[in-house]
């Protein structure tokens, strides 16, 4: 709620600490509007406060990586305005490539076309989905869970090729729903590619939250990737 944001912001404002608030994409939640309203209310009383509210245009695990990039810049001692500028610059690089257990949750939530939803339910296909710039896009299908995970890896490869990604340039993690053992198996499938192309030896695994699980169902699995904020090469 607006009051939740006011309560979170005020101690920092009173201490003279500038704030960067990174909100889930507006396509999935009204939290950014609440944060913006709270900021405007506070600025009426504290006009010198520095509060920047950013629409992450991403969510779940990838939003977490984005916040960690902001923390990285803070810990490196970047100046506030430069931090905000850099965070806005890397935002467009964020992608989530994932698959889900079945298409019904996306269909009922209005996140995917009804025709594809009916076909998907009838054929028991596993949809492949990309999230970018606050929207989800159908990116293909597979006939089994294992093949759908392999295709997620192929989507990641294509993205890395398109971006001419260099080792150390991107932050990366796996996101999953309820099945942690499957997430560990997926990590094994990914480890050679991620080590070679991204220079990452230990792949982090994170469970997605309920806000996104409502749309994906209990068994999404995929990857999140975003450019490192301190990458200057």
Spell out what each predicted region is.
Residues 20, 27, 31, 35-40, ...:
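Mixed-charge interfacial surface used for oligomerization/domain docking
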Residues 1-12:
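Glycine-rich oxoanion-binding loops at beta->alpha junctions
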């Amino acid at each position: 709620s607006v009051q939740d944001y006011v309560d979170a912001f005020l101690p920092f404002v009173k201490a003279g600490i500038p704030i960067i608030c990174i909100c889930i994409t507006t396509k999935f939640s009204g939290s950014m509007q609440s944060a913006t309203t709270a900021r405007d209310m506070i600025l009426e009383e504290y006009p010198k406060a520095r509060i920047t509210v950013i629409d992450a245009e991403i969510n779940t695990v990838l939003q977490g990586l984005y916040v960690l990039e902001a923390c990285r810049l803070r810990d490196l001692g970047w100046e506030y305005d430069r931090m905000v500028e850099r965070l806005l610059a890397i935002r467009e690089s964020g992608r989530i490539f994932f698959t889900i257990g079945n298409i019904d949750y996306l269909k009922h939530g209005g996140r995917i076309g009804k025709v594809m939803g009916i076909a998907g339910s009838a054929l028991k296909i596993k949809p492949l989905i990309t999230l970018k710039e606050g929207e989800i896009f159908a990116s293909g299908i597979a006939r089994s869970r294992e093949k759908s995970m392999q295709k997620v890896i192929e989507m990641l490869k294509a993205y890395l090729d398109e971006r001419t990604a260099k080792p150390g340039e991107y932050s990366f993690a796996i996101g999953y729903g309820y099945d942690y053992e499957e997430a560990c198996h997926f990590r094994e499938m990914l480890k050679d590619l991620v080590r070679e192309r991204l220079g990452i030896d230990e792949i982090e695994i994170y469970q997605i939250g309920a806000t996104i699980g409502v749309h994906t169902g209990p068994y999404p699995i995929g990857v999140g990737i975003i450019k490192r904020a301190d990458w200057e090469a």
